[in-house]
Amino acid sequence: MDALCEANGTFAINLLKMLGEEDHLRNVFFSPLSLSSVLTMVLMGAKGNTAAQMSQALCLNESGDVHRGFQSLLREVSTSGPKCLLRTANRLFGEKTCDFLPAFKESCQKFYQADLEELSFAEDTEECRKHINDWVMEKTDGKISEILGAGTVSPLTKLVLVNAIYFKGKWNEQFDRKHTRGMPFKTNQEKKTVQMMFKQAKFKMGHVEEVPAQVLELPYVGAELSMLILLPDENTDLAVVEKALTYEKFRTWTSPEKLTEEKVQVFLPRLKLEASYDLEAFLRSLGMTDAFEEAKADFSGMSAKKNVPMSKVAHKCFVEVNEEGTEAAGATAVVRNSRCCRMEPKFCADHPFLFFIRHRETNSILFCGRFSSP
């Protein structure tokens, strides 16, 4: 599973950097685990060059038995309890007139716990779209209401793959609401007032000399999941950190031996972000081109009609960070047709930063984002 987690992590950092390149002032938030799992499920039905390109884009070239690995990984990261909930759910929605191969359907159920629900896109496109959106809304506790926008499916749609991931966690050390107050958040362009939370407690913290930047780990109750924040030093632009960042460096910078537990004053803004992406262009730039072209797409491992290209890869994510903890939801739909010399160290996130929600045991990045504009 280590090779798979490394592949997923590399894909996560690659996509984070690409999504951020378009506009350095734009907030970014997505679930790489959600994306990797749904695209790898599609990969089961891909053959030839289509499969090779998908494997390369997903960094899966040396990951062994990928689907068995995902079976274990998805089981490992799913956790629940009164104070921490993480759920992943997969489903295939297929045109009822299509002849999907039994082996493909069985593999989706076996490795991704994904059922195939047959719908009639040809006869009632809009009703099918609403049905899929309702399923995602249910699986994300209403946080994601419309993964498929108007016009994203058509009478020609043959297969929609949907993966929903939902997380709600409480901080192990909760912030006290009475200490939250308005404070300036500094971007390159201006200052904006944010509701800044405050907590003084023992946290794991480190400093990256190379960039330079601070690293802070905020664990959730149960300690299986934690939020990692990568905050550039006061006079360092976040773009410098993003340019230097690779998955290998992320793993090094956030490794237990690089972080020291100490009493620290933490200032963290309340966050509430919602982001939507059409990822076709980004996946194409990662070399995954044949899957989107009817003349080249080879999904003969999925259906007798192999030349049925993907027509849309939609991803929508929601995150809320407050004094109690974090609520995050992500859904993907694929439509086919420390260093501190002070006595009391301070971690003050009053300027743009990167953040990650990580499963500690497997080192898997479940969500990642950039907060640069309140």
From Swiss-Prot:
<comment type="similarity">
    <text>Belongs to the serpin family. Ov-serpin subfamily.</text>
</comment>
<dbReference type="InterPro" id="IPR036186">
    <property type="entry name" value="Serpin_sf"/>
</dbReference>
<dbReference type="InterPro" id="IPR023795">
    <property type="entry name" value="Serpin_CS"/>
</dbReference>
<keyword id="KW-0963">Cytoplasm</keyword>
<dbReference type="InterPro" id="IPR023796">
    <property type="entry name" value="Serpin_dom"/>
</dbReference>
<dbReference type="InterPro" id="IPR042178">
    <property type="entry name" value="Serpin_sf_1"/>
</dbReference>
<dbReference type="InterPro" id="IPR000215">
    <property type="entry name" value="Serpin_fam"/>
</dbReference>
<dbReference type="Pfam" id="PF00079">
    <property type="entry name" value="Serpin"/>
</dbReference>
<keyword id="KW-0646">Protease inhibitor</keyword>
<dbReference type="InterPro" id="IPR042185">
    <property type="entry name" value="Serpin_sf_2"/>
</dbReference>
<dbReference type="GO" id="GO:0005615">
    <property type="term" value="C:extracellular space"/>
</dbReference>
<keyword id="KW-0722">Serine protease inhibitor</keyword>
<feature type="site" description="Reactive bond">
    <location>
        <begin position="339"/>
        <end position="340"/>
    </location>
</feature>
<dbReference type="GO" id="GO:0005737">
    <property type="term" value="C:cytoplasm"/>
</dbReference>
<comment type="function">
    <text>Has an important role in epithelial desmosome-mediated cell-cell adhesion.</text>
</comment>
<dbReference type="GO" id="GO:0004867">
    <property type="term" value="F:serine-type endopeptidase inhibitor activity"/>
</dbReference>
<protein>
    <recommendedName>
        <fullName>Serpin B8</fullName>
    </recommendedName>
</protein>
